[in-house]
Amino acid sequence: MTNIRKTHPLMKIINNSFIDLPAPSNISSWWNFGSLLGICLIIQTLTGLFLAMHYTSDTLTAFSSVTHICRDVNYGWLIRYLHANGASMFFICLFLHVGRGLYYGSYLFLETWNIGALLLFAVMATAFMGYVLPWGQMSFWGATVITNLLSAIPYIGSDLVQWIWGGFSVDKATLTRFFAFHFILPFIVAALAGVHLLFLHETGSNNPSGLSSDADKIPFHPYYTIKDILGVLMLILILMMLVLFSPDLLGDPDNYTPANPLNTPPHIKPEWYFLFAYAILRSIPNKLGGVLALVLSILVLAFIPLLHTSKQRSMMFRPLSQCLFWILVADLITLTWIGGQPVEHPFIIIGQLASILYFTLILILMPLASLFENNLMKW
């Protein structure tokens, strides 16, 4: 008799995705982040669901309802901080996952890569709207500043902003719709993640060497299930250390002050995971130019497969490209730091140089380095 997991219509899908899936024998821990992102999404959805049971999306009571969750609801403080810091862990895993894809040439799986880029946009939109919900000072002013950027779009800009706001400023209507969108988007993210996996399993995983691994495959279970469990335990350890020892480490103190439209905070800045894009936005004096640069800083990921000029897939055997890749990582860390600094000398010029370097590396230097490496190989 055939095993039920291989015949049952539903079990068969799970079996072919997580149990009998043929996987390369040499994939490193950099391949753990896909499963970690899945765990992050589950944690965020569950904690978010429980928070939504006690949250009220009204400007008069939103801030109080979050306070009520932390003070009066059983383990409400734990759920709230798991959700807030879970978002940070989500983005750490996202950045490492994308970085892995860049380094090892995984972007040559076009459908998987482009759905991944779409997923990144969707998660960023979800996180932005979630940050508005506690209705603190940074929530309100962050929402005002970021939504206002759409007014830079020629002709329809101001109408578009008022349409999103549901009025002439960020107010009750804005908060209510942001809560609705913040609730529905994670389910869209989950569906997209399913499609992401579907396309990945059409080709099979890439591996560190970038070479075909068809001749050397091993079953996903037990090898990679055990390996993924180790990653999950490490993720939960870091998350719990954050939540239980320093839950406000990555937050902004201004968000413990209720939103006040009459009082602007001295430094308006988003959560740490948006700071690199915020720095790029601020480094261009023109409003429309800044918005375009902001969108392009993420959208550039979609162009990376077109810029692949190397004869090798992975960077494993390409020292020059490796060097440029790590310069790009350092540049992104610099941009993240600059995004959190006030707009004054010397931060302005550092931000502008780092922004120019970011686009130059991706669009010009890395493709040129690949061409140069091709010539070194005498192919």
UniProtKB/Swiss-Prot annotation:
Localization per Swiss-Prot or TrEMBL: Mitochondrion inner membrane
Cited SUPFAM superfamilies: a domain/subunit of cytochrome bc1 complex (Ubiquinol-cytochrome c reductase), Transmembrane di-heme cytochromes
UniProt-listed CDD domains: cytochrome_b_C, Cytochrome_b_N
Binding site for a ubiquinone: 201
GO terms for cellular component: mitochondrial inner membrane; respiratory chain complex III
Keywords: Electron transport, Heme, Iron, Membrane, Metal-binding, Mitochondrion, Mitochondrion inner membrane, Respiratory chain, Transmembrane, Transmembrane helix, Transport, Ubiquinone
Superkingdom of source: Eukaryota
Cofactor dependency: heme b
Cofactor remark: Binds 2 heme b groups non-covalently.
GO BP term, pick one: mitochondrial electron transport, ubiquinol to cytochrome c
Binding sites annotated in the UniProt record for heme b b566: 97, 196
Transmembrane segments: 33-53, 77-98, 113-133, 178-198, 226-246, 288-308, 320-340, 347-367
Membrane topology annotation: Multi-pass membrane protein
InterPro entries reported in the protein's UniProt record: Cyt_b/b6_C, Cyt_b/b6_C_sf, Cyt_b/b6_N, Cytb/b6-like_sf, Cytochrome_b, Cytochrome_b_C_euk/bac, Cytochrome_b_N_euk/bac, Di-haem_cyt_TM
Gene3D superfamilies: Cytochrome Bc1 Complex, Chain C (1.20.810.10)
Major place of residence: mitochondrion
GO terms assigned for molecular function: metal ion binding; ubiquinol-cytochrome-c reductase activity
Residues holding heme b b562: 83, 182
Note: Heme 1 (or BL or b562) is low-potential and absorbs at about 562 nm, and heme 2 (or BH or b566) is high-potential and absorbs at about 566 nm.
Similarity section: Belongs to the cytochrome b family.
Task performed by this protein: Component of the ubiquinol-cytochrome c reductase complex (complex III or cytochrome b-c1 complex) that is part of the mitochondrial respiratory chain. The b-c1 complex mediates electron transfer from ubiquinol to cytochrome c. Contributes to the generation of a proton gradient across the mitochondrial membrane that is then used for ATP synthesis.
Subunit-structure text: The cytochrome bc1 complex contains 11 subunits: 3 respiratory subunits (MT-CYB, CYC1 and UQCRFS1), 2 core proteins (UQCRC1 and UQCRC2) and 6 low-molecular weight proteins (UQCRH/QCR6, UQCRB/QCR7, UQCRQ/QCR8, UQCR10/QCR9, UQCR11/QCR10 and a cleavage product of UQCRFS1). This cytochrome bc1 complex then forms a dimer.
Entry-linked PANTHER family: CYTOCHROME B
Record protein name field: Cytochrome b
The organism's taxonomic lineage, starting at the top: Eukaryota, Metazoa, Chordata, Craniata, Vertebrata
Gene that specifies this protein: MT-CYB
